[in-house]
């Protein structure tokens, strides 16, 4: 004769397996109910870049890209499908999806890489590094950062004695 403890364990196991089977059947039915004629996944873009090599534009325009830092470069994933039409040959760096997006319009219709201008002043590089607390234009922060970088380069060129001298590499040959 079978003990009541074994019957309880067998009954609990049977109920657990039965519930698990029902969940597996429910998950198997979900993909079947999805429409099969569904087209490619479309991603929301703020604008469309003229060149995939312009990483700043791609980062600005494609809002749902996951950026992965690799050893030598930053690789964008999730760019979607290849373009279905010919490339445009426009002087602008991108084309906005919405005409009312003023931030997009200022980003897309300016030159791709504005050069930072080095201002030679009698006050020195420290005066160039001072910035105001508010910026008037959307790209003003980027311009200020480029000005700071240019001022640092100018400072290093004016004072070469402050830069470190190159340390000679260790010789691989054994000395006798």
Curated annotation (Swiss-Prot):
Disulfide links within the chain: 47-61, 49-57
Alphabetical keyword list: Cleavage on pair of basic residues, Disulfide bond, Secreted, Signal, Vasoactive, Vasoconstrictor
Region (Endothelin-like): 94-109
GO CC entries: extracellular space
Superkingdom to which the source organism belongs: Eukaryota
GO BP: angiogenesis; artery smooth muscle contraction; axon extension; cell tip growth; cytokine-mediated signaling pathway; endothelial cell migration; energy homeostasis; intracellular calcium ion homeostasis
Signal peptide: 1-22
GO molecular function: endothelin B receptor binding; hormone activity
Residues that make up the propeptide removed upon maturation: 23-44, 68-176
InterPro entries the record matches: Endothelin, Endothelin_toxin_CS, Endothln-like_toxin
PROSITE patterns listed in its UniProt record: ENDOTHELIN
Compartment(s) of residence: Secreted
Site (Cleavage): 67-68
Primary role: Vasoconstrictor.
UniProt record similarity statement: Belongs to the endothelin/sarafotoxin family.
Protein name: Endothelin-2
Species: Rattus norvegicus
């Amino acid at each position: 004769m079978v003990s009541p403890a074994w019957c309880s364990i067998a009954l609990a196991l049977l109920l657990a397996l039965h519930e698990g089977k029902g969940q597996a059947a429910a998950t198997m039915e979900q993909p079947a109910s999805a429409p099969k004629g569904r087209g490619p996944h479309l991603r929301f873009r703020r604008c469309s870049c003229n060149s995939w090599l312009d990483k700043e534009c791609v980062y600005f325009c494609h809002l749902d890209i996951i950026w992965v830092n690799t050893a030598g470069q930053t690789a964008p994933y999730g760019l979607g499908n290849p373009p279905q039409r010919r490339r445009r040959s426009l002087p602008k760096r991108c084309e906005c999806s919405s005409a009312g997006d003023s931030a997009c319009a200022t980003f897309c219709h300016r030159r791709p890489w504005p050069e930072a201008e080095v201002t030679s002043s009698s006050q020195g590089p420290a005066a160039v590094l001072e910035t105001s607390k508010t910026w008037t234009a959307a790209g003003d922060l980027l311009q200020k950062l480029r000005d700071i970088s240019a001022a640092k380069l100018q400072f290093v060129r004016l004072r070469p004695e402050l830069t470190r001298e190159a340390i000679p590499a260790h010789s691989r040959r054994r000395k006798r």
